[in-house]
Amino acid sequence: MRCPSCSHNGTRVLDSRPVDEGRSIRRRRECESCLSRFTTFERVEESPLIVVKKEGTREEFNKEKILRGLIKACEKRPVSLRQLEEVTQSVERELRNLGISEVKSDMIGEIVMEELRDIDDVAYVRFASVYRQFKDLNVFIEELKDILQKERE
């Protein structure tokens, strides 16, 4: 590993520990030449996950897009950024655990909505209204009735 301070190639590992639920390793290193200390992260390179959009176009999965949508849905709601990041990680993990290389955007939206339903009902309705593109007020009211029904159970 090349030292970021002096570019010397010789470094030694002082400490290693798993992070990110065991998916990465954090290493504390020291340069053998200038004794500068720095941190590196090592993780398995995952194969790209491709999202198939409604129009049939394809793009690489981007968890930041999910996070932005969640932040928008949770505006002025008592939901922390940490919770939203956990939802984003959970969604990505669930998709990767499917073991497929392509996933439809509809499936991603449904998974996000299920996660959001457990966190905040108002944010769930906001997200659902954009994601499902309710055609009229009656469809929106039916969704609200479903939420109320599930709360009673």
From Swiss-Prot:
UniProt keywords (A-Z) are: ATP-binding, DNA-binding, Metal-binding, Nucleotide-binding, Repressor, Transcription, Transcription regulation, Zinc, Zinc-finger
Q: Does the keyword Zinc apply?
A: yes
Which terms in the Gene Ontology molecular function aspect does this entry carry?
A: ATP binding; double-stranded DNA binding; zinc ion binding
Source species, domain of life: Bacteria
Q: How is the cofactor bound?
A: Binds 1 zinc ion.
Coiled-coil region list: none
- Region forming the signal peptide: none
Q: Which cofactor does it need?
A: Zn(2+)
Question: What range(s) does the ATP-cone domain occupy?
Answer: 49-139
Which biological process annotations from GO are given for this protein? negative regulation of DNA-templated transcription
Q: Where are the zinc fingers (unnamed)?
A: 3-34
Q: Which family does it belong to?
A: Belongs to the NrdR family.
Function recorded in the entry = Negatively regulates transcription of bacterial ribonucleotide reductase nrd genes and operons by binding to NrdR-boxes.
Q: What protein name does the entry list?
A: Transcriptional repressor NrdR
